[in-house]
Amino acid sequence: YVDVVNTRAIASFAPEYEFRYWANSISSGWIEPSIDLKEKIKGTNSVKLRLKSNRQASRVVLLLPESSKLKSFNIGSQEVEVSVSSVGSYKGYYLIYLSGIYDKKVDLTLNFEEYKNEIEGFLLDISTKLPKHLDKLYQARTGIFSPVHRGDQAILIKNIKI
């Protein structure tokens, strides 16, 4: 089921990064995560967004390229400064990693040095639930190999423009 020997570039946002321990899959049929542009805040370089995992994944990740010049984001009353990731598959991206999402909608305000329409990026939702056609993988394991938080992961990746 899982290739434990070879590495493979499997993420559209990181074509040069090769992952270990991957499995071929067919379409899960799951609904992609959603991102709604609520509004551009007049007189600023900020935009309000709403993110949601439509399959109730535990984690949602927003990736914006370094060229977007993201300064910070607001979630609730908190402002969080950001920096570009310099390692791993998220290298070259601003990374907003939200955990514990499930069925919740998340409102964010993104603050840019200079906002330009059509900033391209990626929205990911990450879950430990695998597609139905991989149920036999669970059955083939003994109890010692049951998944953990960083074990099995199914990731939906959506190309976005904001």
Model-based region annotation:
Residues 1-162:
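Extracytosolic and intramembrane catalytic regions of membrane-associated proteins
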